[in-house]
Amino acid sequence: YGMALFSKSFSFREVVFQSKSKATAELYCSLLKELCSIKAGIKASPSGKIYTVSVKKAENVARIMSYFAHDKSETSLRINFSNFDCEECQSTFLRGAFLACGAVSSPEKDYHLEFSVPYMNLSKSLVTALQEKELAPKVTHRKGYNIIYFKDSEEIEDCLYIMGAGKSMFDMMNVKIVKEIRNTA
């Protein structure tokens, strides 16, 4: 759900997902097939750096919207929290949202994790979802996007853990330990 909702386009006209990672685009395709019985293809940009999955056929778009309990009466895009049946559902959702619109900096350089969201109400819903996981994101605006971000290394570690990125969390902790040792030596 997170990958679809935070994709390039999630509307009753079309659902379009873009990623710099072919593996992520392939995951999106496999989830569309598994959850909604929709077979979609991946198109690479001319440079080969962006992979796009588009669903434009009206009946397929309607199937996706119905599966995630969105209807045409909605005036703005928001997270439908009724899609979360369990604690893990929300963590999986956050992982998908991160794959669709998130970025994290290398801990060797800086501590920064962000979600870049074009819609105000959707970004507010994401802040609420993160706060429900006892995280305290900050919000700013950049180039027409709402940026939900973390700068504190411990908050980033917690967010990574919640999203199921345990290895990345431990990698970050190790870098932080090395930095602290170097600073005290």
Please give the residue ranges for each predicted region.
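Conserved alpha/beta core segments of nucleic-acid transaction machinery
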Residues: 177-185
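N-terminal ordered "arm"
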Residues: 1-27
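DNA-contacting interfaces and partner/effector-binding or oligomerization modules
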Residues: 19, 26, 30-36, 42-44, ...
